[in-house]
Amino acid sequence: MNKAKEQVLEEYPDAKIFIIDTLRFGPGYGLMAIIASEMRKEGKDVEEVAKWLEDNKNRFHQTGWMDDLAFTAKKGRLTRAKAFMGTLVGIKPIGEFDKNGLTTVIGKLKGEKMAYSVLVDFIAETIIDADKQTIIIATTNRHKNAEEYKRLIEERFHPKKVMICDVFPFCGINIGPGLMAAYYYGKPISEGLEEEKALVARLSENYKG
């Protein structure tokens, strides 16, 4: 990244360039770019925007599920037997970014109805100023689920905008089909995702039985 900066400065020596490791992929840093653009339109200078992004990058959440575990098994992250049984009974691992930018499982929910309910409740407890936000929903071949997730989010939070996008191939090849996740700005992500794991466990109790 520093090399790229140096090359640009050779041709445009007066350019202001800031390097930020977003610790996010695809829709995550796409959302950061949207917010940065909005801040510039509000009159904030590039230094202020860059500092805000650096200071707040661990407030960008990824909340969603994987419902096809076969690809996870192929990547060696789960045994084939567990992947088969999990998919068969409708187990949906719930993922979130940790403080290092790695997608980490924070809970496992059974069935779409429960998963939708817990995900929307999770967003409610972690998002900030939902009505002022643009929320991005990313998917790999689960557009029907993404549309339902969008409907539930719009009904609950009335955000400024909800966008649905496909995960591009570079990331999708490492994820496989079955991903559906919302990206938004919220409370700081906790160390080791301990608070987020506890939150999913607590919320899931409301829908058991």
What is each stretch, according to the model?
Residues 1-18, 24-34, 38-209:
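Mixed-charge interfacial surface used for oligomerization/domain docking
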